[in-house]
Amino acid sequence: MYKVVFIGTVASSFYSFRADLIYALLKQGHEVYAFTSEYTAEDLKKIEHLGAIPVTYTLNRGGLNPLEDIVATYQLSKKIKEINPNLVFSYFSKPIIFGTLAAKLAKVPRVIGLLEGLGYTFTEQPERLSKKIQLIKKIQVFLYTLALPQLDQLIFLNPDDPHDLLDQYSIKVKKVEVLGGIGLNLNHYKFSTNFSSNISFIFIARLLAEKGIHDYIK
């Protein structure tokens, strides 16, 4: 039996997007811990219902205070060390950066990261990036150059992302895998027949200019 630690931020991501992976690990007899920094009591109950063990920790997802992040990383490493896992799996930008560093401090044997996308700082904007966003991007790239080489494996979903991040900024990673789209569990998100005869158009994306919201409105 292995102990596997998942490090995310928003608690709902565990039961919305990681449930099948957690079920598969539990079925194989492994113990799964779900680290979340943004949660409610109801969220923690839903994680328990999956069969995973919820663990709360502190990490400001949008914070830019380096001292705060250093303290959070140290505290996170202590929590990881108490569990003594065989593997740490982080997803989302900040958990991949600080979760990886914390896992290495805790001497975890294997550390894996999943980047589902590079985020708005790496997205071309109709207008140039603001100076603040440019600064955030520089900080993010610097932190990636520190953290990503520590990973045993880095998984991407978008086949363009390895070039846009690793090649563009000369970041060395031990092993890279492009998984592609992870899809939906159709037993959970079941097909429903069209209940309206009217033709309608739906915009499924974040309300950002680079996602095409202006084109959709026009």
Model regions and ranges:
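A short, active-site helix/loop in glycosyltransferases that binds the activated sugar's phosphate group
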Residues: 141, 148-176, 183-186
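N-terminal strand-loop element at the rim of the active site
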Residues: 7-68
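Membrane-proximal helix-turn-helix segments that form the acceptor-binding/catalytic region
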Residues: 23-28, 74-77, 134-154
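Nucleotide-sugar donor-binding and catalytic loop/hinge architecture
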Residues: 1, 47, 186-200
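A short, histidine- and acid-enriched strand-loop-helix "catalytic/donor-clamping" loop
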Residues: 9-14, 60-64, 105-134, 153, ...
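Nucleotide-sugar-dependent glycosyltransferase donor-binding/catalytic pocket residues
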Residues: 13, 62, 93, 184, ...
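Conserved donor-binding/catalytic core segment of Leloir-type glycosyltransferases
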Residues: 181-183, 193-211, 216-217
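Short His-centered aromatic/hydrophobic patch
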Residues: 90-96, 115
